C-alpha cells in the first residue's frame, strides 16, 4: 500500500521549546539539534525558548503561539516527579496521534532496549497546531526528527490545512 501523494512543497513555520530546569541557550544541545534539523530540511524556525518544567509555563507557551504550524517540545517526558510536559500538553490536545508515541517507543526499543517504556513522547493537535513532545536526550531527538517528524511534517500540516 502506497501513501497518497501530497500536493507539493508548503511553508511550515515551527517553534522549538525546551523544557528544563537546568538548560541554558548555551547548553541546550537538543533544542539546538531540533532547530538545525528543521533548517536543514528547509523548515522555518520562528520561535525558540527554554522554559522551566512547570505545567503552567508549558501550557501558557503553547496557548500563546501565533503563526506557528508545528511546535516541538523537548524535555520532561519521563516519569520523574519534575517531568510534567506530557501531562500539561495532553490536557490541551484536541486530537492525539497515538501512532507517533507507539512508533517512537518501538524505534527507541531497537536502540536502548526495554528502557523505552519510560518514554511518554506524544503528538497531537492543539487549535490546528501540530504538537510534538520529545525526550530531552539528543539521541532521542535525532531519532524522532529523522525517522518520524521530518518525513511526515509536510503531510500532517497539509492535512490540518485541508
Task: Give, region by region, the residue ranges found by the protein language model.
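Non-catalytic beta/alpha edge segments that cap or flank active sites
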Residues: 1-162
Amino acid at each position: 500500500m502506497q501513501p497518497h501523494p501530497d500536493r507539493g512543497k508548503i511553508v511550515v513555520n515551527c517553534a522549538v521549546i525546551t523544557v528544563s530546569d537546568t538548560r541554558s541557550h548555551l547548553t541546550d544541545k537538543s533544542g539546538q539539534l531540533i532547530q538545525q534539523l528543521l533548517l536543514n530540511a528547509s523548515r522555518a524556525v520562528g520561535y525558540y525558548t527554554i522554559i522551566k518544567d512547570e505545567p503552567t509555563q508549558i501550557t501558557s507557551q503553547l496557548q500563546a503561539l501565533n503563526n506557528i504550524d508545528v511546535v516541538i517540545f523537548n524535555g520532561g517526558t519521563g516519569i520523574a516527579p519534575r517531568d510534567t510536559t506530557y501531562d500539561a500538553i495532553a490536557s490541551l490536545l484536541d486530537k492525539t496521534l497515538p501512532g507517533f508515541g507507539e512508533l517512537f517507543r518501538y524505534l527507541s526499543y531497537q536502540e536502548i532496549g526495554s528502557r523505552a517504556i519510560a518514554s511518554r513522547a506524544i503528538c497531537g493537535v492543539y487549535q490546528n497546531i501540530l504538537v510534538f513532545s520529545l525526550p530531552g536526550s539528543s539521541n532521542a531527538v535525532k531519532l524522532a526528527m529523522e525517522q518520524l517528524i521530518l518525513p511526515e511534517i509536510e503531510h500532517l500540516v497539509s492535512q490540518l490545512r485541508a
